[in-house]
Amino acid sequence: MCDKNGCGDNPYKHRSSPDYYGTGLKVDTTKPFTVITQFPAKDGVLQAIVRKYVQDGVVIENARKEIIMDQEFCSAQAGAEMYSKLGGHKGMGDALARGMVLALSIWWDESGAMQWLDGSESGSGPCNATEGFPKAIQQIEKAPTVTFSQIKWGEIGSTFAGSNSTMRRWNA
């Protein structure tokens, strides 16, 4: 089954942190950065989904790390009903235990202008209703590109250097 909306976590929308990522902000989107996604479990049960970033050799914790992306967080989100119906964090943890294939893609959104991701109308970011359309992007950047590199997987905290303070709460 497909869960189109899933359970999302956007620092701008869900953590009231509009100054977290963007040009010149805490995660400066004009420079390369690494995205770390962790799936801590306790006794084999997924407890949360943790996101952090590494930029210029510095580990940057997610905005307002006291807000935990756990089942309670997901259940409170409008549009995440199917996520819970399909098993929520328990179902996600079970699926991770069975094994998954990583798939990366680029979304060239000619109909929605990526409003779900960073649009002001959706409350997800500062972008206006038209600047996310591919034709508008190509006016600014003639040949936009993205690079996926140095993809790693392993035990939590083993794929990057730096502090892993977020994990202390799951080891209790």
Q: Which role does the model predict for each range below?
A:
Residues C2-R15, V27-T34, P40-N171:
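Aromatic sugar-binding interfaces of carbohydrate-active proteins
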Residues Y21-L25:
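Short surface loop/edge beta-strand patches of beta-sandwich-type extracellular domains
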